[in-house]
């Protein structure tokens, strides 16, 4: 099945990600996943017996859980994850790098220099 990524979130306290995806039939899911690849807006996911392909390439991700999309649930996830990249503040520096489990920021934000 083919899915288009609409939004994404990073959870620095768990080192996992969330992606809001939709199908051609307008079925929407929230995917909770971990792995070495950060799924971004506009990416195309294909799922099947082969696993998960992103933009036509196999990627190392593990889907932990899939939730039916609910705007309240998505906003709850977003409000409880303290990552400046989740708010599209990509030109800023991160002051939360010490508590973040990602060795390299998925958004490419630099740690705040003290």
Per-region residue spans from a language model:
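Short solvent-exposed strand/turn elements
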Residues: 22-28, 80, 87
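Structural detector for short beta-strands of small beta-barrel domains
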Residues: 1-13
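Short aromatic-glycine-enriched beta-strand elements
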Residues: 14-20
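Glycine- and charge-enriched low-complexity intrinsically disordered segments
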Residues: 61-114
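Beta-strand/loop nucleic-acid-binding surfaces
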Residues: 25-39
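Short, Lys/Arg- and Gly-enriched loop/turn segments at beta-strand edges
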Residues: 50-62
